[in-house]
Amino acid sequence: MTAVAMGIPTVRSSVSLAGRPDVDQLVDRFGRVARDLRVSITEKCSLRCTYCMPEEGLPAIPAENLLTANEIVRLVDIAVHRLGVREVRFTGGEPLMRVDLEQMIAGCAERAPGIPLAMTTNAVGLEHRAAGLARAGLTRVNVSLDSVDREHFARLTRRDRLPSVIAGIRAAARAGLAPLKINAVLMPETLSGAADLLEWCLSEGVALRFIEEMPLDADHEWARENMVAADRLLAVLGERFTLTEHGREDPSAPAEEWLVDGGPATVGIIASVTRSFCSDCDRTRLTAEGTVRSCLFSDQEIDLRAALRSGAGDEELAQLWRGAMWNKWAGHGINADGFAPPQRSMGAIGG
């Protein structure tokens, strides 16, 4: 297999603010307000999930192009205090690949007290760091886990690390990183084990959310005719459990919730493709290289790193960020004629 390029989109240093109201928040032309910040801190990962990364991994980002821990802390500070962000989630790649993660979390917790600091992780090695991350100020984690069958897990991730993942999940629970949620990608390869995964999550007392696979794989092999839709999953789970529709926690929450066997336990389904929630999206994304991405599927990014390293003040950086979000698309366009997936894969963008 040949190496897969990072697929860098068009990166701009400025954008038009024409027509934008004079408000501090991250508003866009369709009336949405971004309050949920996703910060990708690395492209590196300890697994090679087939829907996210090629087997050999992604090309390394030159160290000088990565945001430092202090730069990330400053940008999070700006997002919270100038732009109205109310939640921050660290993603990758795999965030645990950064040895300065605890420093980063502690800095953000100090500069933005009271703001939830979350992390999406594969949990490999988390058993050794969960307590320290909690002490630093991390409040909760989501763990990517598609199977609790060791052989199946190894095929999906190309790594035999399931025991480490389970140990990490349990360590996170002991450290009080709650609510602890499991994210599982819906694929033909995972559908047969979906009920077993839900059974395991119920026994561990953790929430489970299934996510429809989106066209964000590094090998660009996603095909609509092969994807597993939410309705198919519901039929499969319904063979073992009684599911009762429970709606969404709030309008901007992506997961539709279903009570399992009358509750109180629930299972969530994020139907990103078949029942998109773009009209309620409240996310803004910062890549590991310091660019703002308004949508997973955007073909443009706005460069904050260059401005930051050139001495730009906080308000100048905030205004660049506002411009990036003002021009956000109405939706991801997956269901539109002529849709073209982004060149960056999920591993390069940050989940």
Swiss-Prot record:
Cofactor: [4Fe-4S] cluster
GO BP terms: Mo-molybdopterin cofactor biosynthetic process
Keywords linked to the UniProt accession: 4Fe-4S, GTP-binding, Iron, Iron-sulfur, Lyase, Metal-binding, Molybdenum cofactor biosynthesis, Nucleotide-binding, S-adenosyl-L-methionine
Protein role: Catalyzes the cyclization of GTP to (8S)-3',8-cyclo-7,8-dihydroguanosine 5'-triphosphate.
NCBIfam families found in the cross-reference section: moaA (TIGR02666)
Family to which this protein belongs: Belongs to the radical SAM superfamily. MoaA family.
Protein name per its UniProtKB record: GTP 3',8-cyclase
Source organism: Rhodococcus jostii (strain RHA1)
